[in-house]
Amino acid sequence: EKKIFLIKSEILKFIKKYKNEKKTIVGIAAATKGNTLLNFCGVNYKDLKCIIESSPYKIHKFTPGSAIPIVNEKNIKKYDAAIILPWNITKHLYRKLLQKRKIPYTSVDKIVRKLKK
C-alpha cells in the first residue's frame, strides 16, 4: 500500500519538474491500467499534452476522467518528456518510441526498480 503512494509521488515530481521547465510532457499508450494510474495521481489534460497511441480505435478520443486527448504515436517527436503508462511493456515502448530520441521518461516499472535500490 505504501509503495503506490511512493509511485504517485515520483510521477507527480516528474511532471512538476518538466512543467516548471516549461517542457511538454506526454503519456505513452492509452491502456486501462495507465488511465487508472493517471486518475489515482490526479493527472489530467493540464499536466499531459496528450497520450501517444498506435491503436486506431483509441486515437482521436479522450482518457476517461482526466480528459487527455489520445493521438497517433507518430507525433512523439514534438514532445520533451514522457510517462510510459502500461508498466508491463515499458521496455518495449521505450525502445520503440523514446530510446533513439533520448527523450527523458518515467514509468511505474522504472520507479519500482529505483525504490528497490
Segments (PLM) and residue ranges:
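Hydrophobic, well-ordered beta-alpha structural blocks that scaffold small-molecule cofactor pockets
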Residues: E1-K117
